[in-house]
A protein has these predicted regions:
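N-terminal Rossmann-like dinucleotide-binding module
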Residues: 1-38
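Short beta->alpha connector loops
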Residues: 8-11, 62-64, 77-80
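Donor/substrate-binding cores of folate-linked one-carbon enzymes
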Residues: 21, 54, 69-185
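N-terminal beta-loop-helix "entrance" segment that forms/cooperates
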Residues: 32-52
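Short acidic low-complexity segments
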Residues: 58-67, 231-233
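Internal anion-binding site segments
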Residues: 180-267
């Protein structure tokens, strides 16, 4: 099968790799390189790097699309497809939630932050409307109490690869079904979402840290990132912390560095 791939982040790469092993990839569309970090180093997306390592042509602008594949497969591409793409071939999107719950750009982080114990992966037909296409297939998986964005992405990669290969092998087995149920949208996330409110419950703070990989706040007047936590019954334990301008350390080392000063969790 001739296929065009569209995607950007890390968790998409294993899925694209499985497709490329079995099918003819005509082109890969991904986010253009952009400045990253404090030094604003121009950085290619994980999918861009993967495509180049496999000698596959890489494109960034929808206006560059001029292909006639048997399928367009999309996963976390970050943009709604234009009609020239939608009309060129069947377009299938992998979305990491149980649609129509958590449409939009941050379904995994939102599920973890909300403390959901279950999520899923859906394959759907692409339309002009955001994540609103008919469903071809959905599979559920559990979100454990200590799962993070990264570990859930690993689950999505494995399940998603199996799903798209199954669909490509026998698409007639998966007729499209309209989405049903309550529609819930997610929003783009940023540094502001990582700010901890100490008035929240221990489990809510734990969920925030594992959703975003860091919780930001002041402790004893110092800006810190709380990188890892765990629940001990109803209590929250801080495992790894990173004071501003320093390397990550365990909580005990941080407290020892206060030399007996009382730990004060600031606003």
């Amino acid at each position: 099968m001739k296929v065009v791939l569209m995607g950007t982040p890390d968790f998409v790469v294993p899925i694209f790799d499985e497709i490329a092993r079995r099918h003819d990839v005509l082109a890969v569309f991904t986010r253009a390189p952009k400045p990253v970090g404090r030094k604003h180093i121009i950085t290619k997306s994980p999918v861009h790097i993967w495509a180049e390592s496999h000698g596959l042509p890489v494109y960034h602008k929808p206006s560059e699309y001029n292909f006639k594949p048997d399928m367009v497969f999309v996963a976390a591409y970050g943009a709604i497809l234009r009609d020239n793409v939608l009309n060129s071939a069947p377009c299938v999107n992998l979305h990491p939630s149980l649609l129509p719950r958590y449409r939009g750009p941050s379904p995994i982080r939102t599920a973890i932050k909300n403390g959901d114990a279950e999520s899923g992966v859906c394959l759907m037909k692409m339309t002009n409307e955001l994540d609103a296409g008919d469903i071809l297939m959905c599979k559920k998986f559990d979100i454990d109490i200590d799962d993070t964005n990264e570990t859930v992405e690993e689950k999505v990669s494995k399940i998603g690869a199996d799903m798209i290969l199954e669909d490509m092998a026998a698409p007639e087995k998966f007729p499209p079904v309209p989405q049903s149920g309550k529609i819930v949208y997610t929003a783009k996330t940023g540094v502001y979402d990582e700010i901890i409110d100490w008035k929240k419950s221990p489990i809510e703070i734990h969920n925030l840290v594992r959703a975003f990989g860091a919780g930001r706040k002041k402790i004893n007047g110092t800006d810190v990132k709380i990188l890892k936590t765990k629940m001990n019954g109803d209590r929250l334990e801080i495992i790894t912390i990173q004071p501003a301008g320093r390397r990550p350390m365990d909580w005990k080392s941080f407290v020892n560095g206060l030399h007996g000063t009382e730990v004060k969790f600031g606003e």
